[in-house]
């Protein structure tokens, strides 16, 4: 039985690879090698999960969903397990697998991932869709636990960067433009990161300032 995974370098995929042996592992760099292989089982964990980017750039995010659909179609597995998210639900509590979902009421992140779920359900009636909540572990790159540990915002909107950079030369020199309305922290040096953490705390703005728009808990 040939078992393959797409998204093996991501948070979920990398942890699955530690606990399970796959016959082939793919990501965006080598995905074309998977086309036409018709594996018995495909674990698809290859959808980007930056909620804040998806909600700010809905069309671009939808394009990544369409790309995922095309990847699955061209891989043509016999069965599929899709790694999805509880963000497809319209509320953050009191829901289960039988809860109706109205995409029109969802933010782009949840709406677009529900579109992928629906395609998988239609084309693979015996598929398994796993909707993950906030998770933590090795290789964690985001969510409120990551923010509590690191404090420094990984990304800043241009207007927030302009505001903070006027108050701090260190912040001004620590972020680089991404071409999508956001700037990303480019600092790797531990000493500078320590100073940057103190700088954000002193200014009263840290990664914990971000929240999930559907709830009151610190999360994004």
Label each residue range with its predicted role.
Residues 2-22:
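N-terminal Rossmann NAD(P)H-binding glycine-rich loop of SDR-like oxidoreductase domains
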Residues 6, 44-45, 80-86, 130-132:
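SDR active-site strand-loop-helix element
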Residues 88-112, 149-156, 165-168:
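Catalytic loop of short-chain dehydrogenase/reductase
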Residues 33-77, 86-94:
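NAD(P)H-binding glycine-rich loop region in Rossmannoid oxidoreductase-like domains
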Residues 119-217:
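NAD(P)-dependent short-chain dehydrogenase/reductase
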Residues 21-39:
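A short, well-structured beta->alpha microelement
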Residues 62-63, 93-130, 134:
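Catalytic helix-loop patch of NAD(P)-dependent Rossmann-fold dehydrogenases
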Residues 82-95, 135-139:
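Conserved catalytic-site region of short-chain dehydrogenase/reductase
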């Amino acid at each position: 039985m040939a078992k393959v995974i797409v998204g093996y370098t991501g948070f979920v995929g990398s942890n699955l690879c530690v606990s399970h042996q796959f016959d082939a592992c793919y990501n965006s760099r080598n995905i074309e090698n998977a086309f036409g292989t018709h594996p018995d089982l495909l674990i698809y964990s290859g959808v980007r999960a930056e909620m804040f980017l998806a909600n700010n750039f809905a069309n671009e995010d939808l394009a990544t969903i369409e790309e995922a659909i095309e990847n699955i179609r061209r891989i043509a597995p016999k069965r599929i397990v899709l790694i999805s998210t509880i963000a497809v639900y319209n509320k953050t509590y009191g829901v289960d697998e039988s809860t109706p979902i109205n995409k029109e009421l969802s933010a782009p992140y949840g709406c677009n991932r529900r579109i992928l779920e629906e395609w998988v359900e239609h084309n693979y009636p015996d598929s398994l869709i796993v909707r993950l909540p906030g998770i933590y572990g090795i290789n964690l790159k985001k969510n409120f636990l990551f923010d509590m540990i690191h404090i420094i915002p990984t990304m800043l909107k241009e207007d927030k960067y302009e505001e903070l950079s006027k108050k701090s030369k260190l912040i001004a020199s620590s972020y680089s433009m991404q071409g999508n309305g956001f700037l990303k922290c480019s600092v790797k040096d531990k000493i500078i990161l320590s100073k940057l953490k103190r700088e954000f705390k002193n200014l009263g703005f840290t990664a914990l300032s971000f929240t999930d728009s559907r709830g009151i808990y610190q999360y994004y």
